[in-house]
């Protein structure tokens, strides 16, 4: 299968406790798309997070701005709830997908509104490290749905 689709996941995290699980889904996704996972955590973000939520969110946005390309999706607890089938339809027929996972303070409302879509994986507040793993699984599931693979039953 030819991988014409580019999937980018941009996140802000110090460590990846779920690395083994994330790698499993990254490998499975590679059958359907080229996947890039980019952690943009830097010293400026670390300092801003120690100041306050406003400065932290500004630093996240500055780190993410150069990567706004393709169909851009913010992961946001206030975003739209989708079923796996609805998510599969959302990402179908796109050439490039860019997902943005905020840090400990989430993302600024203005940044979220500047993107193409806001997706909620849950109404619960989730650790951003876990969100990436959950997102990878749902991307893989969506590809399986769109390609009639039996993974999604």
Curated annotation (Swiss-Prot):
Keyword S-adenosyl-L-methionine attached: yes
UniProt entry keywords in alphabetical sequence: Cytoplasm, Methyltransferase, rRNA processing, S-adenosyl-L-methionine, Transferase
Documented EC number(s): 2.1.1.177
Enzymatic reactions: pseudouridine(1915) in 23S rRNA + S-adenosyl-L-methionine = N(3)-methylpseudouridine(1915) in 23S rRNA + S-adenosyl-L-homocysteine + H(+)
GO cellular component terms given for this protein: cytoplasm
Localization in the cell: Cytoplasm
EC category: transferase
Pfam families: SPOUT_MTase (PF02590)
Record carries keyword Oxidoreductase: no
Binding-site residues, S-adenosyl-L-methionine: 75, 102, 121-126
Molecular function terms, GO-annotated: rRNA (pseudouridine-N3-)-methyltransferase activity
Family: Belongs to the RNA methyltransferase RlmH family.
Known partners and oligomeric status: Homodimer.
Function: Specifically methylates the pseudouridine at position 1915 (m3Psi1915) in 23S rRNA.
The protein, known as: Ribosomal RNA large subunit methyltransferase H
